[in-house]
Amino acid sequence: MSYQVHITSTAEHDIMRAADYIEFTLKNPNAADNLLDAATEQIGSLADLPQKFHLVDDPVLASWGIRFVIINNYLSFYTIDEEKQTVIIVRFLYQKSNWTAILRQGFSLI
């Protein structure tokens, strides 16, 4: 059964901010395009089997059902709403950021 994939406005902003940083600060538009392509592909693949990726190691975040997929040097965090058959992408953060603290501050599901 296929799931719908919903990207929150915060996660969309995260993705665009990452691509802008790579393109304009690092001056590497090809890498920015590659990141966007990889994000589109990996996030889209969650529609088929969202359970294939693990829960995060943090016990609090895991209790919230937060999973992640690695996309280049970034982590895309998501939850699964089994009742609605929906995957919700909540954040897209740099792998070396303090993502545990960022996620523990809370996030929007819209």
Question: Model regions: which residues?
Answer:
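PIN-domain endoribonuclease scaffold, especially VapC-family toxins
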Residues: 4-6, 34-44, 63, 68-70
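Generic structural signal for secondary-structure transition and capping sites
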Residues: 27, 44, 48-52, 74, ...
